[in-house]
């Protein structure tokens, strides 16, 4: 009988923010299960290795929690050349239309996974919403004519009737996501597929692509929970993979995750926030005991974001340019555009989140440890530290998931 050694995904790694090695281990396990080989986990023969590549924490038992529903979404699908470069978008935003309405209604900033892990490509998108008719869309002259010329020929032969018949609209405009985001000043985004599990803020005017998962919350506490080691481990084990990169999906990673009591998506479904003196945002109307934990998480998360932003866009190398003011408006609805100062273009181009997490400087690790400690405190865990085994964290989270799943039956 042959043996195959498999790296235990529950063992702490030198770089816990990367999961590439674990994906390779999973493939080794699959090959072993398809043969007569006996599997050794970290050098020891084990009776059972679960589908999530652990010997004693069976996360395949984790259930979707109703308290998490309706908050995280895979974003829009284009199915056509709806995207345009920033220079063209800004020109269109200054153009009049025969019905007197602004192109800002249908020309929006756009972001995909690359814009998150690298730098924003200054791509915009034409978006005629979820139910705008062809007759209603056509007076937005330049955007409509672009779509008619570049999208309609491709869509006319599409086998799916909704794509073919509604060629001027995005193939999957995700109305539930739009409804959940309505009225928020910002939202949380993470790449579907990435080397590192990163969460960032995106301005409300940005339309996200399907290579991003969007969470409809504007408070720093929720971002901190999602960016904690606890959620990262959970999402790595319960997510899938694309080649050597972990994939994040709302159904497996988000909807199963047992948020701290009082800070679940159901608890914060009202989406209202309260600003702390330092500018951090927490969910409004929290009970005192929960509020203390929310404040700690929010402050730690805001500190991380502030440090990252300063590294990505150092003021010595970059400058903020006022964004375009669309025709008919008195001020720009968009945040200032960050560009490199003359002579620093190459240096700024290297300042990406992927490069930052590859470097993982001490200040970044410390900022994440502060988030982890604050989130663990919200669970009542006083022993959380970088030395706490991954398997122990997952065991506790699974127990909480199963407890809540049983209560919702």
Model segments located where?
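S-adenosyl-L-methionine
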Residues: 1, 19, 23-44, 51-409
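Conserved beta strand-loop-helix elements of the APE1-like EEP
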Residues: 1-12
């Amino acid at each position: 009988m042959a043996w195959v050694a498999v790296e235990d995904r529950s063992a702490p790694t030198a770089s816990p923010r990367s999961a590439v090695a674990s994906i390779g281990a999973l493939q080794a396990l699959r090959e072993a299960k398809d043969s007569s080989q006996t599997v050794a986990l970290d050098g020891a023969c084990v009776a059972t290795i679960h589908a999530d590549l652990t010997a004693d924490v069976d996360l395949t038992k984790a259930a979707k929690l109703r308290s998490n529903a309706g908050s995280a979404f895979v974003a829009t699908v284009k199915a056509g050349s709806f995207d345009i470069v920033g220079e063209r978008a800004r020109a269109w935003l200054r153009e009049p239309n025969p019905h007197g309405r602004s192109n800002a209604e249908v020309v929006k900033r756009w972001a995909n996974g690359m814009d998150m892990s690298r730098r924003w490509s200054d791509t915009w998108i034409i978006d005629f919403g979820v139910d705008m008719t062809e007759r209603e869309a056509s007076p937005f002259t330049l955007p409509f004519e672009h779509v008619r010329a570049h999208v309609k020929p491709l869509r006319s032969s599409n086998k799916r009737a909704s794509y073919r018949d509604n060629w001027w609209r995005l193939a999957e405009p995700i109305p539930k996501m739009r409804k959940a985001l309505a009225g928020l000043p910002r939202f949380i985004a993470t790449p579907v597929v990435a080397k590192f599990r990163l969460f960032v803020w995106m301005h409300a005017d940005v339309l996200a692509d399907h290579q991003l998962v969007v969470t409809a919350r504007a408070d720093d506490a929720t971002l901190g929970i999602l960016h904690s080691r606890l959620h990262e481990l959970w999402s790595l084990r319960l997510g899938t993979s694309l080649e050597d990169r972990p994939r994040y999906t709302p159904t497996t990673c988000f909807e199963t995750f047992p948020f701290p009591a009082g800070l679940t998506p159901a608890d914060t479904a009202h989406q209202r926030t309260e600003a702390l003196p330092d500018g951090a945002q927490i969910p409004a109307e929290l009970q005192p005991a929960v509020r203390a934990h929310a404040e700690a998480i929010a402050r730690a998360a805001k500190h991380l974001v502030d440090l990252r932003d300063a590294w990505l866009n150092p003021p010595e190398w970059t400058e903020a340019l006022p964004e375009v003011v669309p025709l008919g408006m008195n001020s720009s609805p968009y945040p200032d555009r960050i560009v490199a100062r003359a002579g620093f273009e190459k240096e700024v181009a290297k300042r990406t989140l992927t490069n930052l997490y590859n470097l993982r400087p001490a200040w970044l690790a410390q900022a994440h440890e502060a988030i982890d400690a604050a989130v663990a405190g919200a669970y009542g865990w006083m022993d959380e530290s970088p030395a706490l085994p991954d398997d122990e964290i997952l065991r506790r989270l699974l127990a909480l998931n199963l407890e809540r799943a049983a209560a919702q039956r």
